[in-house]
């Protein structure tokens, strides 16, 4: 059902985009209001359940921040000396992210990074999807973007513990985790990941590789969804949820 609603909304987005309405201030405002409603009530489930993982003075990392729906939520939870690191590569999304943080009064506790997260520092290509503002992805061709590793981003922040990471990077999830091994070993943050086996396979990875990698670091898998009790599930159950072109949100703790 979630995928059907998303496809319908994307078709509407493509039609409206052709009218030029999205280039106007009112059009953009309406779109982002609708996007926020979709994220909150359709896609992300019980986001408030993640709050228990955020302690005073700790770091939350939002990888694939888009325009900041999760970032704003996380920023309201951190306190003391804690802060959020939000990473988003695409220019228009990044500008809207900054605007949304300023408008929500949360910019003071968010450190934004324009780029992608991968297994090593460097320059990669980002393929832009003209009809899906949340589907830009690392590819062989596209615009140049700077790539960072998680371990690099927190290198100067070792006095702080990374308590929570959200990863939504259109199939590059394994690459993100490979560049975060020191952080995973040291801090063992809770990790919310959107897993799409088809997208992962297009990048030479798979849902099984991502889940197994995290289990090797001592993580257990929990369901994450609307009204979910976040029950622990097995590897086989997790992989079964990813079959037939479905993508799922899983929480690793």
Where is each model-derived feature located?
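Phosphate/nucleotide-binding beta-alpha loop and adjacent structural elements of enzyme active sites
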Residues: 1-253
């Amino acid at each position: 059902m979630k995928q059907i609603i998303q496809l319908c909304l994307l078709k509407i987005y493509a039609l409206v985009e052709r009218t030029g309405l999205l280039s106007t201030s009112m059009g953009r405002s309406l779109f982002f209001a609708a996007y926020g409603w979709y994220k909150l009530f359709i896609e992300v489930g019980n986001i408030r359940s993640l709050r228990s993982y955020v302690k005073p003075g700790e770091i939350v990392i939002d990888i694939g921040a888009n325009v900041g729906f999760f970032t704003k939520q996380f920023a309201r939870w951190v306190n003391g000396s804690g802060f959020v690191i939000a990473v988003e590569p695409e220019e228009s999304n990044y500008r809207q992210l900054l605007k949304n943080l300023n408008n929500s009064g949360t910019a003071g506790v968010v450190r934004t990074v324009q780029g992608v997260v991968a297994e090593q520092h460097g320059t990669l290509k980002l393929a832009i999807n003209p009809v899906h503002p949340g589907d830009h992805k690392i590819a062989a061709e596209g615009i140049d973007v700077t790539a960072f590793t998680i371990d690099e981003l927190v290198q100067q922040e070792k006095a702080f513990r990374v308590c929570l990471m959200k990863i939504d990077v259109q199939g590059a999830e394994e690459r993100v985790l490979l560049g975060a091994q020191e952080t995973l070993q040291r801090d063992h943050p809770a990790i919310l990941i959107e897993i799409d086996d088809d997208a992962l396979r297009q990048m030479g990875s798979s849902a099984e590789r991502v889940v197994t990698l995290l289990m090797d670091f001592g993580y257990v898998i929990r369901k994450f969804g609307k009204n979910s009790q976040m029950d622990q599930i097995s590897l086989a159950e997790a992989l079964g949820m990813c079959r037939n072109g479905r993508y799922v949100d899983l929480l690793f703790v």
